[in-house]
Amino acid sequence: MPELTATPNLTALFGKAVLTGFTRRGTRLPDTVYEQPNVSVDRTHLARYDRVCEFRLTDELPVTYPHVLAFPLQVKLMTDPGFPFPLIGSVHLANRIIRIRPLRVDERLTLRVHVENLRDHARGRQFDMISEVLVAGEPVWTGVSTYLRRGGGSGAEKARERVEPPEPTAVWRVPGNIGRRYAEVSGDRNPIHLHPLAARLFGFPRAIAHGMWTKARCLAAFEGRLPEAYTVDVRFKLPVLLPARTGFAASTVDQGWGFELFDARTGRPHLAGTVTPGA
């Protein structure tokens, strides 16, 4: 297991992805596991993240924050020579977070990242990027990000049925600069989030919000109402074109919650998720 003594440099890795990534073709995922021990949380950075995602400023890490800590390890793995797909162009389909207990800002963390479960998708191939956080050798947080690499799929995806959105419990104005602001705190500087001109090169009429920002913003609305241990699943749907006016709806489902984010004017869905107690 390769052990990292410092956080990978995202600027260098994204440059590597641009220069070498588009020619990648492969059929197998690497079995590499990257580990970075003795990671401390920068309180200033945490406060900036909290403000961008609208979490309260506390000594407890937001449930989505460890994803930001592990993201450089994910990018390092996805830009390694043995990774079969280009980093640029990968689509974030879904994200699951399993929180075994809350994490505090003063705890020393070990980050661990690997990839698994390569499988077919109607539009190509999908795989799961697994991120783990351990404290004193004990797992306390797991994130599963499912990515799609388009091309070569069966094309047999079911047509989406038109579903009327629920009545919103809140309406949020999403500023046009949220992509740049989240990029600054997350390190995810994909050009589709930063500027309309760059987004148009990839087929979007305007810059779009990061999927993990939309998930974080939704979970910030639940602060103070969730148990210590829970699993939160999200499927990303249509992108949030910036600036935007979004509707948020939440309702109780069994012992947990269901929630949705959608365009407040058209009802077009952006995200659907569930929170289930326990881990």
Please provide the spans of the model-predicted regions.
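Hydrophobic beta-strand-centered segment that forms part of the acyl-chain substrate-binding groove
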Residues: 61-115, 125, 214-249, 256
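Hot-dog-fold acyl-thioester-processing enzymes
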Residues: 1-94, 154-225
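Hydrophobic residues on conserved beta-strands that form the core of alpha/beta folds
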Residues: 34-36, 142, 229-231
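HotDog/MaoC-like acyl-thioester-processing domains
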Residues: 1-29, 73-75, 93-174, 242, ...
